[in-house]
Every structure is written in C-alpha cells, then in structure tokens.
A protein has these predicted regions:
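Intrinsically disordered, low-complexity linker/loop segments enriched in Gly/Pro
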Residues: 116-212
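N-terminal, Lys/Arg-enriched amphipathic/low-complexity engagement segments
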Residues: 30-87
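A generic structural signal for residues embedded in beta-strands
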Residues: 60, 109-112, 219
Length: 248
C-alpha cells in the first residue's frame, strides 16, 4: 500500500575492508513486507527472511515506531494505553529482518548503500511528561506537560511522489520531507539487543538523520550472513529526538 513509512532499497557488499560495489538489479526485487517486519530485537537466532547476493538491491517495508498506533491527535503516548507497553522493555520500534547476505563472514565489513526511501501520507510526533532530552527542561516546561500528539500531513511534490514532497505542520508552517532510517544494524555478537533501546558498534536505534539516501553505512559482521535489520523510518528530524520522537 501507499501508506508506507519506509521502503528501502539497499545495496550491500563486504570484505576484510570496505570496497566499492557494482550495483546490480534483479528483474524481481526481493522484499520484506510490513506484516513480516515485526521483530523487536536484533537476534542472531532469528531465521532469515531474505537471502541476497553481494551488490543485490532489496526492499523492506516497515511499520512506524509505534506499529501504526498513532492515527489522530486523540491517540496519546500514555504507556498504559499502548500495545506492547506491558512488557519490559516495551514491544515497540519494530524492525524488518534479518537479511542474510551470502558469503558474509565474521570479521567482514558490511557496506549498506541507501538507494531510496519512500514515506507514507502522514507522520506523527508524540510528546509527554519527561520524554526526550527536553522532557525536564526548565526553559520549555510546556514540553513536559500533558501527552500531546501532532499528526503531520504529507503532500506529494512535483514528481507526484513523496520523494520531493512537503510536510504540512499547519497552514503557515511546512518543510521538505527529509527521510532517514532511525534503526539499522546487524545481529550483535553474543547478546540479544532490543530494537527500542539497543545501540552498539553493530548499529541499533541510532536516530541519526544522516542515515539517508545517498549515504553509505559500514557495519562489522559477527555472524555468517551478517543478519541485517532495519526499521523506524522517519519523515524528518533535527539533530536528535528532543521530545522523544521525530516525525515518525
């Protein structure tokens, strides 16, 4: 469907050191669907959903960080009302994977070239008490008030797609859609890391806006096949999630 928060075509290559790769495309691109992208951990025990060759592009359709919970301003980020928040850590921030890259071995370096990201027709921002770096700010105490959800509509650009589209905050404020991948990585060596809190040299929930189209990500390989995951695609973000979320 068109209501997608993040479809990614990715090129990967690997070796004892990073090297450039020749992009090749299959007649039918392999794909992980949104319904399959419901993992909540980077787990080396997961069965791969795709097997790809080095240099092969593939696509992952993702859920937003709340698995579609936020659809209107009436949907608040109150933990007691959110599915999966009765677990510790919460079952939030779903990712798609793992993807098995043929020939990848422990000690290799996996290169991920982000070719394309397509977002859906809206995103959301949810703020509430003590959420994010500004959650206890004395300068902006309103950011730690009641739970508030903002739905941001997306409009297509001249291309007819969201690739050059606009985010409409209100009648007076808008800005370009600038999507990136919030959570990306491979299965860690020994531990199992959650997709909501886990971070390390293997990747994780990084929320860095530079993980975007045209950029290359380098990740160490700890397991045969690399076991690559991604999710938590954002339509826009500043330098961090100051109130606990970006435009999800």
């Amino acid at each position: 469907g068109k209501n997608r928060y993040g479809d990614l075509n990715k090129v990967a290559s690997f070796g004892d050191a990073p090297y450039a790769c020749l992009v090749t495309r299959n007649v039918v691109m392999q794909r992980i669907t949104r319904d399959q992208a419901r993992k909540f951990a980077f787990d080396w025990r997961d069965k791969p959903l795709l097997h790809v060759q080095p240099g092969e592009s593939f696509e992952i359709e993702t859920w937003d960080a709340a698995s579609g919970f936020f659809k209107s301003p009436d949907d608040k980020a109150i933990p007691a009302n959110r599915p999966g928040f009765d677990r510790h850590p919460p079952l939030a921030n779903p990712i798609g994977g793992p993807v098995y890259i043929e020939g990848a071995e422990r000690g290799d370096v996996l290169l991920i070239d982000i070719e394309d990201i397509e977002v859906g027709d809206y995103s959301w921002v949810a703020i509430g008490p003590k959420r994010g770096p500004l959650g206890e700010s004395t300068r902006w105490p309103e950011l730690s008030g009641e739970h508030t959800t903002k739905i941001i509509k997306h409009t297509p650009g001249p291309s007819g797609t969201m690739r050059d589209g606009t985010m409409q905050f209100n009648d007076k404020i808008s800005w370009p859609i600038t999507p990136f991948i919030g959570t990306i990585g491979v299965a860690p060596d020994r531990e199992v890391a959650t997709s909501i809190d886990g971070q390390g040299m293997w990747g994780g929930n990084l929320d860095i806006r530079d993980v975007a189209v045209g950029n290359r990500i380098h990740l160490p390989v700890f397991h045969e096949g690399a076991l690559f995951y991604l999710g938590d695609v954002h339509a826009s973000q500043g330098d961090t999630e100051y109130t606990g979320t970006a435009a999800e």
